[in-house]
Amino acid sequence: TLHLVLRLRGGHCQVPCGIFDDPKLVSDIMEAIATIRKAMVQIGELSATLNALNINQMTRWVNTKEEHATKIVSLVSEYCLCQRVKPSADPKSPFKSEADYIAALGSHHNVMLAAVKCKQTVDPANADALESAAKEMGKMYMPA
């Protein structure tokens, strides 16, 4: 059911401009996840030796991790949920039932929750969970 392809008219920039590139959206999210994972690994490695340089580099990696997790939350909330996911009663909705719509909301919410968890931790397992959630959600945005 979550394998729906969202094909709606509207705009990702809230104008609406009618320009969508859903595969690029999925690619951007996956790239952000790869960056988050790398940041987590780097923070772990740098924390083995605490000196001024490593503390500086860890701070930069923490900031990078935060920025990319925030980017994911923004993409999902502002692009996906505000522009692409429409209630099943909406004539532009890709969902055939309320249950499909609710499942899609849950899938998107799981990505946002996992992204926030990545902000809170440096455990690469959380990046893996984010990637898994994003792949599931991403099925809705890839060509059939």
Where are these regions (language model features)?
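Alpha-helical segments in soluble extracytoplasmic regions
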Residues: 36, 40-79, 83
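Short, solvent-exposed, charged loop/turn and helix-capping segments
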Residues: 75-98
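Amphipathic alpha-helix face/heptad-repeat signature
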Residues: 25-32, 58-61, 65-68, 72, ...
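Alpha-helical rod/repeat scaffolding segments in eukaryotic adaptors/tethers
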Residues: 15-22, 48-62, 93-101, 120-131
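Solvent-exposed, polar/charged alpha-helical surfaces in well-ordered, non-transmembrane soluble domains
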Residues: 34, 38-41, 67-70, 109, ...
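Immediate post-signal-peptide N-terminus of mature secreted/exported proteins
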Residues: 6-53
